[in-house]
A protein has these predicted regions:
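Short beta-strands within extracellular/lumenal beta-sheet-rich domains
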Residues: 46-71, 125
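Short, surface-exposed beta-strand/strand-loop-strand elements in extracellular ectodomains
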Residues: 91-103
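Surface-exposed coil/turn segments at beta-strand junctions on protein surfaces, enriched
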Residues: 54-56, 70-74, 90, 117-119, ...
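Extracellular carbohydrate recognition and processing domains
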Residues: 104-134
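Noncatalytic modules at the cell exterior or secretory-pathway interfaces
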Residues: 131-149
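A short beta-strand element within beta-rich, extracytoplasmic domains
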Residues: 59-63, 67-88, 146
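Activation corresponds to long, low-complexity, non-globular regions
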Residues: 1-44
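Exposed low-complexity, polar/acidic, P/S/T/G-rich flexible segments that act as propeptides
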Residues: 4, 150-173
Length: 173
């Protein structure tokens, strides 16, 4: 129950987004903040930097995040990330969003686009039976992988960072 404006509301799991419970950085480094900063869109960012290399085209940030579904059988599932790229022109750094399919034991690419240079929320909604993205053996775990890469630069190579403001799984039971 939550009190808001003198009224009491009963919240269901359909109203509460699944928040980050774990994070693993496969490539890159955390320069500021942490996973605790990702629970809401509040302009408090976790800053992720690619590990410096001699070849700027090999710069990458690769992160896996995990949460827990409110139900093992949600009717609908989505993944929302709010982020921005700092340090260069729009369009040079790509953001790929994958959700882990527990039936095939592999990640499914759901979105791939240039990351914005201002805070921008991207929501992906898988189609079909969304329970494939929920661990069915008791944990109700959700796993997403977000990869930021540079394929080529439109201008000169540059140093860049990613600021992530929010990562959640809004769901409907």
């Amino acid at each position: 129950m939550v009190e808001l404006g003198g009224q009491i509301f009963q919240l269901t799991s359909a109203m509460i987004p699944s928040l980050i419970e774990g994070q693993k950085l496969l490539d890159g480094m955390v320069a500021a903040g942490g996973a605790a900063d990702l629970d809401e869109s509040d302009d408090v960012h976790e800053q992720l930097d690619p590990v410096p290399t001699r070849n700027p085209l090999k710069q990458i940030v690769d992160v896996i995040v995990q949460g827990q579904a409110g139900s093992a059988t949600p009717a609908d599932l989505s993944f929302r990330i709010e982020s921005r790229m700092n340090g260069g022109p729009a369009g040079d750094v790509m953001q790929a969003i994958h959700l882990f399919n527990y039936q095939t034991n592999s990640f499914e690419l759901l979105d791939n686009q240039a990351v914005a240079i201002t805070d921008t929320a991207i929501t992906v909604r898988p189609t079909g039976d969304v329970t494939r993205f929920v661990q069915q053996t008791g944990t109700r775990e959700l796993t997403a992988r977000v990869i930021w890469t540079v394929d080529e630069f439109t201008g000169a190579a540059f140093d860049w960072t990613i600021d992530v403001d929010e990562i959640v799984w809004p769901e409907t039971d």
